[in-house]
């Protein structure tokens, strides 16, 4: 039986479990070399590993919480203004769309666009939905839940995005 022995320099850091930023929520912030060729980081040195914690922090926040009293969506949209964002409810779904036209940044010109669609729980009071954008770019979509005996109405309507002057105090989970 032949066993192939690989030098540790050619092993990929954490193998298939190594998180890739390629499809994360970056909205055009640029790619690093390790995003396209993640195995190169481990070929430099057998002891070099890209920080997993930094990768998680760099990915922005996209969190959905649903507890007994409310439904909450936290979405990092720091590159968009309230005018660039559209939030609407269609039946049992909330759709969040962000788009800004081409503008200049440090590296040239860039335009960004994203679509997110979330299913609302059936017991969310759709008449009391709210959406706000904090000063640090955190979009908060919130809806209280109704008692199980009450029925929430389902139709299409737009939810205005209000701007808050203070940064978000999004609790980490």
Curated annotation (Swiss-Prot):
Q: What is its main location?
A: cytoplasm
Q: Which residues form a coiled coil?
A: none
Q: What happens to this protein after translation, modification-wise?
A: Undergoes age-dependent proteolytical cleavage at the C-terminus.
User: sHSP domain: from which residue to which, for each copy?
Assistant: 52-162
**Could you tell me the Gene Ontology terms of the biological process aspect for this record?**
lens development in camera-type eye; negative regulation of apoptotic process; negative regulation of intracellular transport; protein refolding; protein stabilization; response to heat; visual perception
Where in or outside the cell is it found?
Cytoplasm; Nucleus
Region spans: Required for complex formation with BFSP1 and BFSP2: 1-63
Q: Where does Zn(2+) 2 bind?
A: 107
Deamidated glutamine is found on 6, 50, 147
Outline the subunit composition. Answer: Heteromer composed of three CRYAA and one CRYAB subunits. Inter-subunit bridging via zinc ions enhances stability, which is crucial as there is no protein turn over in the lens. Can also form homodimers and homotetramers (dimers of dimers) which serve as the building blocks of homooligomers. Within homooligomers, the zinc-binding motif is created from residues of 3 different molecules. His-100 and Glu-102 from one molecule are ligands of the zinc ion, and His-107 and His-154 residues from additional molecules complete the site with tetrahedral coordination geometry.
What is this protein called in UniProt?
A: Alpha-crystallin A chain
